[in-house]
Regions:
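Bacterial N-terminal signal peptides that target proteins for export
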Residues: 1-11
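C-terminal motif of bacterial Sec signal peptides marking the signal peptidase cleavage site
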Residues: 18-21
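Bacterial signal peptide processing site
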Residues: 23-25
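Contiguous beta-strand segments within globular domains
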Residues: 29-56
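Acidic, low-complexity Ser/Thr/Gly/Pro-rich repeat segments typical of extracellular/periplasmic
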Residues: 48-143
Length: 143
């Protein structure tokens, strides 16, 4: 077989790599981290495992089963991780009693901007107290 006969196959393979790129470590999605919650005075605090220098860049809060257009998004929020916890005060978001919420947030390293972590937690507010509840299958990415 001559080169001209193989040219279409070569161009197909070559153009595929040009269009989609080579697979690498950045192409793999990381599963969401799960976390626990506790109440500290009026704040709702989420545990941050190995906080190092991670800070939230996005927080999304929604009631369970709410459509995405009803989710509340905070880009570059004013709350920070301190002592291994991300605490949300009532002045930032008011969680209503007798509801179940899904809280998602992205943590990003200050030193290494390419290091991001996605965290999700489901919480129930009952009689003004908070507790963790199991996530539904469609609320987190487990991979």
């Amino acid at each position: 077989m001559t080169f001209t006969a193989r040219l279409p196959a070569f161009l197909l393979v070559f153009s595929t790599f040009i269009l989609v790129g080579c697979p690498g470590s950045g192409d793999r999605l990381q599963p969401d981290e799960l976390t626990s919650v506790r109440q500290v005075k009026g704040d709702i605090c989420f545990s941050v495992n190995k906080p190092v220098d991670y800070q939230p860049t996005l927080i999304v809060i929604s009631t369970r089963l709410a459509p995405p257009q009803e989710w509340v998004l905070y880009e570059n929020p004013s709350v920070i991780v301190t002592q291994g916890e991300l605490c949300i005060p009532p002045s930032f978001y008011r969680f209503l009693d007798n509801r179940t919420y899904v809280v998602r947030y992205i943590l990003q390293s200050k030193k290494h901007s390419d290091l991001r972590r996605s965290v999700v937690s489901a919480i129930a507010i009952t009689n003004s107290s908070v507790r963790s509840v199991p996530l539904r299958e469609d609320e987190a990415a487990y991979y």
